[in-house]
Amino acid sequence: MKRKVVRLSTLFALFSFVGTFSAQEKKKDSIKENSIGEVVIVAFGKQKKEEITGSIQELKPKDISALQNGNVLQGLAGRVAGVQIVGSGQPGSSPSIRMRGIGSINASSEPLIVLDGIPYPGSLNSIPSSDIESLSFLEDASSNALYGSRGANGVIIITTKKGTRKGIHVDFDIKTGINFRATPEYDIITSPAEYYLAYFNRVRVGEKASGKTDAQAYTEAINKMNATLGYNAYNVPFNQLINPDGSFNQNAKLLYQDNWQKLLFRPNLRQEANLSFTANTDKLKAYTSLGYLNDRSYLIGSGFKRLSLRSNLEYALNEKLKFGVNLNYSNSEQNLGDGGSFANSFQFSRNIAPFYPVYLRDNDYNRVYDIKGRAVYDYGDGKGPNGARRSYAVFENPVGNRQYDLNKVTNNTVNTNLFVQYKFLKDFDFTYNFGGVIINSQELVYGNPLGGTTATVGGRLAKSNTLKYAFNHQQLLSYNKQLGSHNISVLLGHELNQEKSDYFGARKEKLFLEGLTVFDNVLKMNEIPGNQYDYAVEGFFSRVLYNYKNKYFFNASLRRDGSSVFSKESRWGTFYGLGAAWDISKEDFLKDSETVNALKVKASYGQQGNDIFYFPGTTDRIYYAYKNLYKVSNFGDDTPVVTTEYLGNNKLRWENSQNLNAGFETALFNRRLSINAEYFERKVSDMIYRAALPFSNVGYYPRLENIGNMRNRGVQVSISGDVVKTSDFTWNLYANLTHYKNKITKLPDAQRENGIADGLFLLKEGSDRYAYYLKEFAGVNPLNGDALWYKDGVDAKGKAVKQVTNSYAEATLYQTGKSAIPKVYGGFGTQIRFKNITLSANFAYQLGGWGYDQNYRSLLHSDNYASNYHRDVHNTWTPENPTASLPRIDISNSNQNASSTLFLVKSDYLSLQDLTLSVGIPQKFLENYGIRDANIYVTGNNLFLLSKRRGYDPRLSISGVSETYGYNLLSSVSLGLNLKF
């Protein structure tokens, strides 16, 4: 009997096709059946897809094979329904992930990561994507309930490969490519002449606005250029650079020009190779792999290297007893980008004026070299030509820093999972799982003594070592029974998860020899920090699965958790999940339909908890939320000084998340079209936030309290279908869309009316978490170029009205009605195969949100120092351009570009996430070499971005605020070869 297999990709939100179906063209009854034995990874086991009552989406190796990321989650934007992924260009970095909205304000909103059934506390950059068999995204309560206190923000279950193919197989994959910067820089000034003119005009316009004549304004502008800018890149004096008519002196000759961005950002090499062996016999399943990755970034001196080894073994001693072990070792080295300071390469190269040199020059403008023949870098500290000194970022030079400094993290990770399973009394089995993770993390930070801020102390060396242990014990007793048309499965379990971390570091200053990174080479002790923590969570849980005639499905889960984060009075919490589904397509009235091949409706509800809280304003976790934390300092006289770092709260309790999910799944037209639509509602109660404290308590982190409630409500739909499907040609399309609204539903009585100001946002009942709270820009005064804003006032009749003011201090802060939360987000893509040639493309998008472009604002500054401008500075108000939409920018009034709605920008975007062309090598060329299958491919990631403003990348921030110190995303293009033996 001839069969056709229709494969529909598992993909994402609002229109989410999930899975692979089998269809038989000729036999009508077979069309109604899902693929026999098709299972999905769920909490503490597997389930047939048809039995799922909640929201679970699964990605397989074919869905992630095109990714070129040290962390597999980094490249999945737009690939999973309801999931937002915000990444970084730093190779090996972990992205921020949000499932179905915002899970918390001050607690974690990140999902739980489970690796081979065990919660994983490490970074996923230790695991090559080639080792992954599946990624399951659990988004609703019935799916997450068994993870209790850790499942509130969703769960991602990662399952590594086993020896599932019969016989012995060898797979080898190698690819080499280029990494380069994904997004262009803002449209900044790059010409020294253009900058000098822009600065001159900013001063001139400001002086004229203050009442000076043209001649006086010209003279004052020239004098301030000479006094402020410091460096003159031309062969004529400052007072001759610009003519009295405001034009640039055409006789001025440029003496030098260094391009900061070209020296910092260069295409670099990427190399990856993975070798795996699989074996499968009646008793043994084995998978062993060796992986190598060298992911050099386009930012000089930055990158990620990894060497990994994995061995997964499973052995059935007899029909009753089975055991297995998963072993993974990873050694990684991550050379980091710059932190949040003037030395940050992205911030610095964007804002440094283009006439400032990278390299030090003498009075004749020749480069200066040291005794080793190396070019000396210019740090703007008065050593430049004729004693020139910068007015911006003195003692900083990121090109020099990245040449001589080090910021390296080396991780050694050992991960061991063991299990023993014993079946008894026909319908029972008992499983013991053990997971152990040991992570040794060593950080080395070296600041050179040659130049920059560390040179002022003779160089600096800091080293630290963090040793982290995590152990997980699970005991699972299950019962499975079929009684006629009734099927029941019961699970009882206990889990104990323990973590311990010990951190120790030291920092010294004043190096004896340059470049030698051992403490014996450094003379002066600076500090020796250290800390440790212990964390434990214990849970008792149960689950009941029931179905009748494989048409009506029900499940119930219950878990009782205790966490060491809380005091004894608040330590334990109870969490649950309920789910039901009805496979309508198996009913008599629909089973003979030639159009509807599958139709299932489902609903679930439940409650999970959250015990991951942060010190306010940081991403440092609080492990003892109920205790006061202290710091002991010594100021050199052996007298201890004890300061309070954090005020504990022994009444602090769990954040609770109540999740409702309802939807349907259907397959139509001989399973050529698949649709999944779901409605969801997440309510967060007892939300954690920092408390308002008396002024006397200022000086340490404020206390955390359970202050309010929040809600996320939305829909997600995915659709996937085969446009064409023949033996030689297939064409598949998919699309997904997610929409949700966030709303704060309860705050303490003291903050209920006015809300809580939180930076650019206002936390207020009825508003969403990222609702902007800003002064409203009212335009430009055409007479003098003053920026205008609105303020609350009253008219002649005493009626409240908005009035216009040029005083920023008088302007009123308003709820703008604009939010950083997009109206919709998702992805779409296609795969086309013609014989042995396959082309696939995946896109991501978001629409309807707003960003706050802090970078753009800083490039239209009014400060009296020489940082760069956006070219829109030419479109600001001047006497010659009185109708400009941007206000006068001068150095006499810093409020002209003060924070307001002027700097809100639409955060819509469309990005090409990956594009792959693969060509299979015909078998006739392989058979004499023992090669079973081979293909050559070209793949690219992050190849294209459309956004509202050049340089602004909405993909870098969940809050919508442009990342001043962010690491721009990385593009990769590689050529690869895959061989199967």
Predicted regions and their residues:
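Gram-negative outer-membrane beta-barrel transporters
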Residues: 705-822, 833, 844-849, 853-855
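Short, small/polar-rich motifs associated with maturation and membrane association
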Residues: 1-310, 315-318, 322-330, 339-345, ...
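A surface-exposed, glycine/aromatic-enriched loop/edge motif typical of exported proteins
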Residues: 185, 189-242, 330-386, 503-505, ...
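A short beta-strand motif that forms part of the nucleic acid-binding face
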Residues: 151, 162, 176, 291-292, ...
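Extracellular/periplasmic, surface-exposed regions of secreted and cell-surface proteins
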Residues: 32, 38, 64, 90, ...
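Extracytoplasmic gating/loop element in the C-terminal half of outer-membrane beta-barrel translocons
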Residues: 247-250, 453, 563, 846-935, ...
